[in-house]
């Protein structure tokens, strides 16, 4: 009976049942040469969007019989759902790396033009649906899994730049009761906040890139911050319209010197040893404007318990976001504050809803986590399990 429960538990979460009026494809994408899985591949047509998980798997559902695959540094593919039916794996070929003659140039004028054209290049008012997955680990074990499907209305109001309507949610957490430390997820204000470097406080250099249509610009802050860290990262910029299509930053270059902080009214200490952001932007062909297509936040927090017997451990957070549809004019009815801890959201779960949504497939590690939750669901003395399905 327990085994049946595990199978059903995972099946409801994966939601692989299709909708007769939609086309659907669930495949794996790998590098043609190395055969390694490709993460963050953009899968789309002019109506719907999806992406690949860490293992290269994706689910794409659309009313339109067209699929495009795009990843910077690789040749794009265009096909149909029918053409993919007999393929289990999709192979993407990396573009040939053409090493340019080394020329020392001043990239600051180019970067200034990129910044000056941001208002022109990016849409500041639009509505789109999105998928957000939050995974929290304690050391190497998953303790929280949350998937959210919602509408986001982005606008120019500086006091309230984003309005969120959660359409459905599924979550579960699995903690040992001896763990008394509560981890707070970032709110959506922090998640959507831009972190572009100030022009006058950073050094910009160019690095060779294997696509002649783009330039890769590295940046690094001139001075360390109060925690002794250098802010660094890179841009990938379209040469034709000066739009940033990919942005990565890390705020921890020397985590060992980051000072500890204390939790109020406690002897527990903690410090953030990793904080990285990845953002990818796509162009809407109708509006001729770019929008946030994919975003990732990766953070590690070291915790030192106050008790002598307790050993230090790490919380590792991964937040994965991608838009699931093109722009719409649908009105958003906000039902979740953007300054609230994301995991504190309370909404019902509907298996039927998730059957027809573009979403990240579960990785093997996540499936194992759900199996562990189901196998220990009755051990209420040892474990605290919170979930909505």
Where are these regions (language model features)?
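Bacterial Sec-dependent N-terminal signal peptides
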Residues: 1-28, 389
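Short Pro-Gly-centered beta-turn/loop motif in secreted/extracellular proteins
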Residues: 59-66
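A short, amphipathic beta-strand motif
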Residues: 25-32, 56, 90
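A short, solvent-exposed loop/turn motif at the edges and junctions
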Residues: 68-79
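Extended beta-strand-rich segments in extracellular/periplasmic secretory proteins, especially
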Residues: 193-250
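Short, ordered, surface-exposed loop/turn motifs in non-cytosolic proteins
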Residues: 23-25, 33-46
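Surface-exposed, low-complexity/disordered segments
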Residues: 91-215, 260, 268-389
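Short, acidic Ser/Thr/Gly-rich low-complexity loop/linker segments typical of extracellular
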Residues: 48-57
């Amino acid at each position: 009976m327990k085994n049946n429960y595990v199978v059903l538990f995972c099946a409801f979460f994966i939601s692989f049942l299709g909708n007769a009026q939609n086309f659907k494809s669930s495949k794996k994408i790998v590098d043609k040469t190395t055969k390694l899985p490709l993460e963050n591949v953009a899968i789309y047509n002019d109506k719907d969007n999806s992406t690949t998980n860490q293992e290269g798997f994706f689910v794409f559902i659309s009313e339109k019989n067209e699929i495009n695959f795009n990843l910077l540094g690789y040749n794009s593919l265009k096909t149909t759902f029918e053409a993919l039916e007999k393929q289990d794996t999709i192979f993407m070929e990396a573009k040939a790396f053409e090493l340019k003659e080394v020329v020392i140039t001043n990239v600051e004028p180019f970067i200034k033009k990129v910044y000056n054209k941001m208002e022109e290049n990016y849409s500041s008012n639009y509505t789109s649906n999105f998928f957000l997955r939050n995974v929290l680990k304690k050391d190497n074990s998953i303790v929280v899994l949350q998937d959210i499907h919602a509408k986001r209305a982005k606008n120019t109001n500086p006091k309230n730049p984003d309005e969120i309507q959660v359409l459905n949610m599924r979550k579960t957490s699995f903690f040992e009761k001896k763990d008394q430390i509560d981890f707070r997820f970032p709110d959506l204000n922090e998640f959507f906040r831009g972190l572009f470097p100030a022009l006058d406080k950073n050094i910009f250099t160019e690095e060779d890139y294997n696509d002649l249509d783009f330039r890769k610009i590295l940046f690094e802050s001139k001075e360390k911050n109060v925690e002794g860290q250098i802010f660094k990262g890179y841009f990938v910029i379209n040469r034709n319209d000066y739009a940033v299509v990919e942005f990565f930053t890390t705020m921890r270059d020397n985590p060992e010197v980051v000072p500890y902080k204390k939790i109020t009214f406690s002897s527990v200490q903690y410090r953030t040893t990793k904080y990285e952001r990845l953002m990818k932007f796509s162009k809407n062909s109708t509006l001729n404007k770019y929008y946030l297509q994919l975003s990732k936040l990766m953070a590690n927090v070291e915790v030192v318990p106050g008790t002598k017997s307790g050993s230090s451990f790490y919380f590792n957070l991964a937040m994965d976001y991608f838009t699931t549809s093109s722009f719409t004019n649908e009105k958003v009815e906000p039902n979740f504050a953007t300054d609230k801890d994301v995991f504190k959201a309370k909404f019902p779960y509907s298996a039927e809803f998730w059957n027809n949504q573009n979403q990240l497939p579960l990785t093997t590690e996540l499936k194992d986590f759900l199996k562990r939750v189901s196998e220990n669901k009755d051990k209420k003395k040892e474990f605290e399990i919170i979930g909505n399905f």
